[in-house]
Regions:
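Long, highly charged low-complexity segments
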Residues: 1-96, 100-101
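Active-site-proximal helix-loop-helix substrate-binding element of RNase H-like nuclease domains
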Residues: 7-8, 62-64, 68-176
Length: 176
């Protein structure tokens, strides 16, 4: 039997669908340590015309469904694109927001979002990639899903992506 601290995140989780609230969230995140994750749309990916994965090309599109952003135990937001909020708005906010540090489960795939920021050697502590850190601690594991990393290194029990979505992908889940 695994003992883990209670996860109260769901009590503070807020879904944002309007521009005014999204603006307030980003303003509140200023000068904080910010964790984020991008929920890609179907067209996002490093694919070449023949469908092969490319390691060196920019993503095919900047379209995505949402950005999750968290900067305290009580400030946990899921900002959805839609009628009022566009992918380009979220890109601009991520690109221009001044924070103490950025933390992401797969920061490497999101570095292009910081195109206006010149990342220098002195900035190393400002960008933290959870998957790279988990790999450096234990390179023998084949994959590093967020729920396993949270359990192994934080003692938190989180539901997996499969637990939340079942057989759906994010695009279908957002439509339902």
């Amino acid at each position: 039997n695994v003992e883990a601290p209670k996860n109260n995140a769901e009590e503070h989780f807020v879904v944002v669908r309007d521009l005014k609230t999204a603006e307030r969230v980003f303003e509140k995140a200023k000068d904080r340590e910010v964790a984020f994750a991008v929920v890609p749309g179907e067209s996002l990916g490093n694919s070449e015309s023949d469908g092969q994965l490319s390691l060196f090309s920019e993503p095919a599109s900047n379209d995505y469904l949402a950005v999750s952003i968290c900067f305290s135990e009580e400030d946990i937001y899921f900002i959805c694109t839609g009628d009022e909020i566009s992918s380009s708005f979220l890109d601009e906010k991520l690109n221009t927001l001044e924070v103490k540090s950025w933390i992401a489960p797969d920061l490497k795939t999101n570095l292009h979002r910081f195109k206006s920021k010149e990342i220098k050697a002195d900035d190393r502590g400002r960008y933290f990639d959870m998957m790279v850190a988990a790999y450096l601690i234990n390179p023998l594991v084949g994959e590093y899903p967020y729920d396993a990393v949270a359990k192994d290194y934080l003692g938190l029990m989180l539901s997996s992506k499969k637990d939340y979505l079942g057989k759906l992908d994010f695009t279908r889940m957002m439509k339902e």
